[in-house]
């Protein structure tokens, strides 16, 4: 592979972009009940997400170039593998390309535009304010599913998935901040755990409970049948076990393991939505 291409892929954190694209594909397939006749629109949506996500990741590296000279000197920018000017032009080309392609669907266009603005604000203003930053990360994580649904003209079911993902991600980000409390303090970061200590764990648990309470809605509203309900209830039991573990021992070590545990369960929740759309 051409070294320059490799460095640009590293700049945009290509694995993160592919993960976001995959989430968009899953969202589109769920919303279309796995109608592969609409796969062209879904793949187009996943490309847009890849481009906009790449813009956000590149912009973060541009903002962090001075810090990365110390902490991550081998990244493309601090190591001068890519110039700051080239990285800036490249990042905005990604964003503009994504927004132009999104014009095939006006809801997709609106989301792509809003998310690009949110990513810009996150990189420029809120990255070190995790109280707001965590909400932004949670929103962006959930929005990929709505984007997939919008590409096939059905956002209803993905709206519930969006809310479940938003609250679960928000919860997990706060728990991660609790684990990283000492490091964040030394770097002057603002976070709920820094402001409220162990009480922030109760906020995280509250958000996780919101996700649990919303999860049966597809069954209650008649969107999905019993197989979905059975699958999501298993996920909810696992979530509750994570909550009980945190309540019993809200230590940084338990927070670290709970964060990883919650991430696994979130993937199982996504699988439950897939089961619901297929059965």
From Swiss-Prot:
Topology term for the membrane: Multi-pass membrane protein
Catalytic EC class: transferase
Species per Swiss-Prot/TrEMBL record: Methanococcus aeolicus (strain ATCC BAA-1280 / DSM 17508 / OCM 812 / Nankai-3)
Protein name in UniProt: Digeranylgeranylglyceryl phosphate synthase
Protein's pathway: Membrane lipid metabolism; glycerophospholipid metabolism
UniProt-listed Enzyme Commission number(s): 2.5.1.42
GO cellular component: plasma membrane
Disulphide bonds in the chain: none
Top-rank taxon: Archaea
KW Transmembrane (keyword) present: yes
InterPro entries linked: DGGGP_synth (IPR023547), Prenyltransferase_related (IPR050475), UbiA_prenyltransferase (IPR000537), UbiA_sf (IPR044878)
Family of this protein: Belongs to the UbiA prenyltransferase family. DGGGP synthase subfamily.
Coiled coil residues, start to end: none
Methyltransferase recorded as keyword: no
Entry's Gene Ontology BP terms: glycerophospholipid biosynthetic process
Protein's job: Prenyltransferase that catalyzes the transfer of the geranylgeranyl moiety of geranylgeranyl diphosphate (GGPP) to the C2 hydroxyl of (S)-3-O-geranylgeranylglyceryl phosphate (GGGP). This reaction is the second ether-bond-formation step in the biosynthesis of archaeal membrane lipids.
Catalytic activity from the UniProt record: sn-3-O-(geranylgeranyl)glycerol 1-phosphate + (2E,6E,10E)-geranylgeranyl diphosphate = 2,3-bis-O-(geranylgeranyl)-sn-glycerol 1-phosphate + diphosphate
Transmembrane intervals: 14-34, 36-56, 94-114, 131-153, 157-175, 201-221, 224-244, 259-279
Cofactor(s) required for function per UniProt: Mg(2+)
Record's keyword terms, sorted: Cell membrane, Lipid biosynthesis, Lipid metabolism, Magnesium, Membrane, Phospholipid biosynthesis, Phospholipid metabolism, Transferase, Transmembrane, Transmembrane helix
Molecular function terms from GO: geranylgeranylglycerol-phosphate geranylgeranyltransferase activity; magnesium ion binding
Main location: membrane
Subcellular location: Cell membrane
């Amino acid at each position: 592979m051409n070294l320059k291409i490799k460095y640009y892929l590293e700049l945009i954190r290509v694995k993160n972009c592919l993960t976001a694209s995959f989430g968009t594909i899953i969202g589109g397939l769920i919303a279309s009940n796995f109608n592969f006749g609409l796969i062209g629109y879904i793949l187009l949506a996943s490309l847009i997400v890849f481009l906009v996500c790449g813009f956000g990741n590149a912009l973060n590296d541009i903002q962090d170039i001075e810090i990365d000279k110390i902490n991550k000197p081998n990244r493309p920018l601090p190591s001068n593998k890519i110039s700051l000017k080239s990285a800036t032009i490249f990042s905005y080309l990604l964003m503009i390309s994504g927004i132009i392609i999104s014009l095939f669907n006006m809801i997709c266009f609106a989301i792509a535009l809003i998310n690009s603005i949110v990513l810009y604000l996150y990189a420029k203003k809120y990255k070190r304010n995790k109280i707001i930053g965590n909400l932004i990360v949670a929103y962006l994580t959930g929005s990929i599913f709505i984007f997939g649904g919008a590409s096939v003209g059905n956002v209803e079911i993905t709206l519930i998935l969006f809310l479940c993902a938003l609250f679960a991600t928000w919860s997990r980000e706060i728990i991660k901040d609790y684990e990283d409390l000492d490091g964040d303090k030394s770097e002057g970061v603002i976070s709920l755990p820094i402001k409220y200590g162990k009480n922030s764990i109760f906020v995280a648990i509250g958000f996780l409970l919101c996700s649990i309470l919303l999860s049966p809605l597809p069954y209650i509203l008649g969107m999905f049948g019993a197989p979905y309900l059975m699958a999501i209830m298993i996920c909810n039991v696992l979530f509750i076990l994570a909550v009980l573990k945190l309540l019993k021992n809200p230590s940084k070590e338990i927070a670290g393991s709970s964060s990883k545990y919650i991430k696994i369960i979130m993937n199982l929740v996504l699988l439950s939505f897939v089961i619901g759309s297929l059965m």
